[in-house]
Amino acid sequence: MTVYTYTVFLFNWENIGLMEQQNPDRLKKDRELIYAIVTAKGIISRFFWSILSFLITNLIFFFAAFVALLIYLLASVDNQFAFVFIAAIIFIIFYNIFFLSYLLFIYFKGQKAIENNCKYLLTILDIKSDELLPFSLLGSLRKGYMLDEMLLEQ
């Protein structure tokens, strides 16, 4: 059973009423698992788009600095263009420091949410970060089939 069909089944109101009558503890665990999956997806997508925007913005800044340097070298202009190039490089350095500190803030905020909200969330976040990002933010070596095994154990 995939996560999608499991979620659709779980949030069908008739099934929730039936499951509550049969085993209320099981329903609580299932709700916690679905909450963990949704929260992990949100955290990972925020990381992914933050890193992507960071790389794209850096490319734009470096291209602008490179164009300024080419204009300075090819044309006979004042030394003010060298100042523009140096200012662009300094701006890129400070932008990188600021944005990397922002990514660390998101990372620690996500870690705190993991510890406070759900026991399943750390495992799911490890699995999804391995699938979505070129490197694992949590240093995980787990594979996607662990999520299916965890659902089957429930």
From Swiss-Prot:
| Membrane disposition | Multi-pass membrane protein
The record's Gene Ontology cellular component field reads: plasma membrane
Changes seen on gene knockout: Not essential, it can be deleted.
Annotated membrane-spanning segments are: 54-74, 81-101
Keyword annotations for this protein, in alphabetical order, are:
Cell membrane, Membrane, Transmembrane, Transmembrane helix
Asked whether the UniProt record includes Methyltransferase among its keywords, one would answer no
Please name every pair of cysteines joined by a disulfide bond in this record. Answer: none
Where in or outside the cell it occurs: the entry states: Cell membrane
The name on file for this protein is Uncharacterized protein MG149.1
